[in-house]
């Protein structure tokens, strides 16, 4: 299994404490420290780091994974959401440590590209009702929001299988039963992914 480094910075330096840390003195508990962990991808070590919320991710050294589901913003982006990219980088490094390769084969798409893919799917599947099971139109898809990844679609499926098994740690979830390659940041890192939907036509 991959390793998660947990760090707590105290006033005097760094202590290796868990999220519910206990300080002991002469074998007696004198104080219990509780903190909400912040998930960060530490670029120098290529490891997932849990830092205390009051410290946060280190600017220039960490990529923050965010503390909740990543939702659409108010303006259309032109690239993948940075926190989604940080989540993938963190998972990718953990998978690499186990000898598994993960690749983003498709991520951000413009509205025009997404609508083109939907129209192409209609021609392939004969009706919009069938096409939408595989490709959503631009106004419904999360690809144009920079919030969806197609992982290892054109490569070894083992990378996507690894991410399905371990992605919740990084806040990444497989979404559809009929698309083993499609992942979205549906939960906070360390949460529980929702049940798979049969296909995209069941999207609410």
Protein language model regions, located:
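Extracytoplasmic cell-surface/polysaccharide-interacting catalytic and binding patches
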Residues: 2-107, 111-204
